[in-house]
Amino acid sequence: GRVTLQAAQAMLGRVYLTMAGYPLYDVEKKVKAKELFEEVIDYADAKKKFWAKDAEEWKNIWISDNDNKYHIFEIQYIMAANYGNPMVYWTSPSVSTDYISISMSGNGSVCAAPLDNFFKEERNEKNEYLDVRCLATIDTIKTFPNGKKYSGEDFFIKFFEHKIKRTQLGYGDIDAQIVERGYFPINFPLIRLEDVMLMYAEIVGPTERGIDMVNRIRKRATGKELTDEEKESEAFQKCVDNERRKEFAGEGIRWHDLVRHNDMQPIKNKFYYYAEKYGGDPMIMSYADRVKRGTHIYPIPDHQMKVNEGLYQQNEAYR
């Protein structure tokens, strides 16, 4: 693969929008970001690229047969030792062989309760989850097809190409080719058209095109568009944030949104709340304690610190 013009424009636009938020607040960068996002969206619309037209097609994005079709820029993986997507194992608990023949030893970065509940808020007249992204992103199973019980939290399956998922979507079985947990071939998106659309909507607000960006994504997922109340400025921004939270769950984007909006402390407070709710859970408490002043930026990698001792000073939060 190669980096396309649209990938460069999308990534640069994201950088500009990041600079417009916390802690730099260089708001003039929003103009540059908007221009770049418009070019990417216009290109995608004209060429009919990067977009799944309906909910059923959206589910197929997360099948390796469709790698390099929907994402603007992605990390390439193949079905070979140490060249597969490690995300699958990291986010999977111990599952039954109905899913996959190899052992998944339960690393299980499970879906946090607030996101889990958020996905499940609305149901249709058949009492099914209204948002199709819910069951395409997380598995809510409590009894595996072979009768084995699962008592853990709901877990991410967006990148998990298990046997049941591929069969349901009409794809062939690749189970025999996944000989160990480092063989999963599904690519990992670095930026998608939906990301560009929602960042654009965040910048322009509830304009005609801003509303259209949100409605395209929301209607595909739920069949519903924004209400008149949700088209008001403050409510609209909340809707943009909510769509980002659901659309990109498990893709490593949420933290950067929280930093850009300077929402780290409210989220930290939520972690403390849930820690207390679950009897002072030390693991949840430790997650909250990791968020402190200065952690909005990453540490300088250790191997870079050692290239030339004294050349760099480690970022304050990590000293």
What are these regions (language model features)?
Residues Y83-S96, Y273:
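Short, polar loop/linker segments at the starts of domains and inter-domain junctions
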Residues T4, V110-E121, P301:
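Residue-level signal for threonine
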Residues T91-D116:
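Short, cationic low-complexity segments
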Residues V88, V110-A112, S151, F156:
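Intrinsically disordered, low-complexity, compositionally biased regions/tails
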Residues G1-Y83, E128-R319:
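Acidic/polar-rich alpha-helix caps and helix-coil junctions
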